[in-house]
Curated annotation (Swiss-Prot):
The gene is ldh1. It is an enzyme of class 1 (oxidoreductase). One of its GO terms (cellular component) is cytoplasm. It catalyses: (S)-lactate + NAD(+) = pyruvate + NADH + H(+). It comes from Enterococcus faecalis (strain ATCC 700802 / V583). The lineage of its organism: Bacteria, Bacillati, Bacillota, Bacilli, Lactobacillales. PROSITE patterns: L_LDH. This is L-lactate dehydrogenase 1.
Amino acid sequence: MTAAAGNKDHQKVILVGDGAVGSSYAFALVTQNIAQEVGIIDINVPKTEGDALDLSHALAFTSPKKIYAATYDDCHDADLVVLTAGAPQKPGETRLDLVHKNLKINKEIVTTIVDSGFNGIFLVAANPVDILTYSTWKFSGFPKERVIGSGTSLDSARFRQAIAELVDVDARNVHAYILGEHGDTEFPVWSHANVAGLQIYEWVKNNPDVDEEAMVNLFFNVRDAAYTIIEKKGATFYGIAVALARITKAILNDENSVLPLSVYLEGEYGQNDIYIGAPAIINRQGVKQVIEIPLTDAEQEKMEASASALKEVIETAFAKFEAEEAK
């Protein structure tokens, strides 16, 4: 039995990386009453101590929780370890540009966590997330079900929100996915996008006041949203923090929720040996099932192109990494 399948009454999360994303995620755990114990790890120990103290002052307004500056030894009985640590994405830099800097960091962190005796679930959010989820799986030796990336969860939320604003409907009643890489080769699954069960094209047809040209161009704003935010404020962190909190809740509460995440494919969508954004059912065991929704020919081509781009980077990055390790 994994740690994640153990004591449901005391849920323990360890966060590795107390930067903008990590601290925002910890704040979301506190305000949403998720988990009973939250440990924060970072090379900047005074920062983790300060954040833990600051967050503890909110507990009288939320719910009891143990929050503290943790060490890697504290991972041994955690249900979930969330990885946000890594080199930040700079203005003009793609997520894939980050891979060479972050692979080494990832290996050091993951092997240290595994050495602690950790036997729960890894949730990866550091970018490029699909590649670092794959490397976490490789370096940990864990089953694929217990290594999950945030994938296109935030991209899909941005997509739903953008559609909602255009058609003037609550985003919670818009159902739509962005699949593929969390990055430049991601793509919208328009063929399954719907508002309250009505296919998006039917909705537009029935509501002539909806700007069709704006609908067509909507995805590009979604795809490039991170670059826009980074240019304006230096980093994105609130959206992904809440996405991570949602994933955490689904895992710890054994929800069997369907979310678009970076998951390992074994034949689904015609892909193998890759972590990439796809819908999956998740619960306390991790990934219960990858859902293969039927794509149009054009969408399938985009999935294949996205997977090919990721695999090319993975192969190049790992070859370089292994060569450096062998020196």
